[in-house]
């Protein structure tokens, strides 16, 4: 199955503590999860590694969120949208289901 959500897509969170927040997808994992910029921030307690010169402490980083809990954001409608696939000039492209507009890659 082709990936409906891709890197650099603007998405909106549908459920959870960050519901309603928008962000850009930084990484798509093979497990069906994505990492979104500024969303699902967790605090990780980092041990110091003197050999590498790394300092210890509490580091805030983005954790993965399931792809079913996000939707692509349509700027034209200002809402979350669904994605479809179609062929244009022999190429498979993604489009917004609500208005049929092609999604630029």
UniProtKB/Swiss-Prot annotation:
GO terms, biological process: translation
Domain of life per record: Bacteria
As recorded in Swiss-Prot or TrEMBL, the protein's gene is named rplX
Assembly, in brief, is: Part of the 50S ribosomal subunit.
Family assignment from sequence similarity? Belongs to the universal ribosomal protein uL24 family.
Native organism is Aliivibrio salmonicida (strain LFI1238)
Which Pfam families is this protein grouped with?
KOW (PF00467), ribosomal_L24 (PF17136)
- Note the SMART domains from the entry: KOW
**What function does this protein fulfil?**
One of two assembly initiator proteins, it binds directly to the 5'-end of the 23S rRNA, where it nucleates assembly of the 50S subunit.
Give GO MF terms, alphabetically. Answer: rRNA binding; structural constituent of ribosome
Q: Does this entry carry the keyword Metal-binding?
A: no
Q: Which NCBIfam families match?
A: rplX_bact
List keywords of the entry alphabetically. Ribonucleoprotein, Ribosomal protein, RNA-binding, rRNA-binding
What is a single cellular component term in the Gene Ontology annotation? Answer: ribonucleoprotein complex
Q: What is the protein name for this chain?
A: Large ribosomal subunit protein uL24
